[in-house]
Amino acid sequence: ALQGELLHLAAHDALDEAGIGRGQQHLLRKDIRGDAIHWLDRESEAQRHYLDAMAELQRSLNQALFLGLFEYEAHFAHYPAGAFYQRHLDSFRGRANRVISTVGYLTPDWPADGGGEMVIYDPDNPSREVARVVPEAGTFACFLSETIPHEVLPTRLPRTSIAGWFRRNASLGGVLDPAR
């Protein structure tokens, strides 16, 4: 259902070009990131089911690891053929607002030569690749937002996923750091 919803949004030009940075530093940079997104907002039964599952994961992470996670934000991501996302971190060091990143893959029957893998790098040696995640439907990846460098390799076929972040409330100069 989530895959169908994302493809429907893409077919009706209802996705936004993804950018980098936040607030006044937000930029569209196709040379860095080529996907299009739509934020999840519980508007469908499938989104509600997914977000409820993430709320359960949040409770489990908080109970087991005392992370103080208070919110989860997520968006559909559609990578057209040829798109990629250069190596990056999901949270600026020292900000600690995004704590755990998640990626749930939606594309069924992903071929071995489809490209679009997420490459995870060693945080202590960023040139050393430690894992490749094939973007096959049903695969779910979770990693530390502030310390794990990763990238999406160029895809040869359209690639779909849900990217999300468990957040901790960070105070920036006495002002709460809002989601998105």
Where are these regions (language model features)?
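Fe(II)/2-oxoglutarate oxygenase catalytic core
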Residues: A1-S101, Y105-F140, E146-R180
